[in-house]
Amino acid sequence: MTIDFRTETTFGYTTGACAVSGAYSALYFLKNNKKLDFVEILNLKNETLIIPIQNIERSENTAFATVKKFSGKDIDITNNMTINVEVTLQKLDNNSNLKLIEIFGGNGVGIVTKRGLQIDVGDYAINPKPREMIEKNLISLLNDGEKAVVRISIPNGDEISKKTLNPKLGIIGGISILGTTGIVRPMSNDAYKESLLPQIDIAIQNGFENLVFVPGNIGTKYAKSVLNIEEDQIIEVSNFWGFMLEKAGEKGVKDITVFGHAGKIVKLAGGIFDTHSKVSDARNEILCAYTSTLCNNQELMKKILQSNTTEEIIEILAEKDILNEVFNLISKRVVERLCLRFPNIKFSCIIVDINGKILGKCFLGDRFD
């Protein structure tokens, strides 16, 4: 398969593919004294990617190439980001017949500070597959006895990274160079799901036996303060509860507390394990069903079903003085659902409102003091 990104508008290419393209064009310039407007690189599946080069310059034995990140129709925070690659060509000892490639990060590329990732602590966040792709494509340009030193940098990478998961993963100072195939596929959750998994690895490496699964940043904020736990113990799952819980089980996790805002967590009580509103939204119906077990009031049921937000329903239940009873029931049902689907894991559930106040809870796993 060949994808020509000079004309392609649906697919995009990864930060890893940007780094490979920049490195190849820079080394090609050093070897052939010719600037390339585009490069043809191979990914690890031997698929050809044709990627445009924005700019290229040289100074003696060093060349500098610039590639602009393109995400296709799967627009993300790194779309149109500039990636700079510097390549220096060096001679080895006269008797050497080796071909060497060294890869480093520069400004705007993150540095790993936590165990559990694919990269050693203290190293630049350039994942193994992009490193392998760089080596695969550059090695053919080298003669025996030559070494290419590759350094990748990203203007504003530090600022961009603050809008990604990198700070939570312990990757500081910039973004990561990622990608297994070099191709960004549109409207696919697969890459995003995979990006969430290192959180579990880091928690396991740090020896945490009870993990706290939350929907996102708000859940993380209140879980830290309410439960008095470390951030590395908290796993943000976004909407992918089924996927993340399944992977946690595969990795040997035995005790999980589900913690989060009522609007997300009540869906789990209904057996909904992808909580994105485009996939499913039965919050009002679930809350109505559990309220009906405590109160036979048709007008109340209508109010709940017609409410615009979960917070509005919380206010209605508080006025009727059944708020905690309803959410304790829902918490219990969440635990029952999870235990049924993932029988090798002990579950607990804590549901909070928009301000982090506990509405309901059910403990089967280890308690938090």
Curated annotation (Swiss-Prot):
Pathway info: Cofactor biosynthesis; adenosylcobalamin biosynthesis; cob(II)yrinate a,c-diamide from sirohydrochlorin (anaerobic route): step 6/10
UniProtKB keywords: Cobalamin biosynthesis, Methyltransferase, S-adenosyl-L-methionine, Transferase
Biological processes annotated in GO: anaerobic cobalamin biosynthetic process; methylation
Cross-referenced InterPro entries: CbiD, CbiD_sf
The keyword Lyase belongs to this UniProt entry's keyword annotation: no
Catalysed reactions, as listed in the record: Co-precorrin-5B + S-adenosyl-L-methionine = Co-precorrin-6A + S-adenosyl-L-homocysteine
Top-level taxon in the UniProt lineage: Archaea
Pfam families linked: CbiD
Family classification: Belongs to the CbiD family.
Protein name, per record: Cobalt-precorrin-5B C(1)-methyltransferase
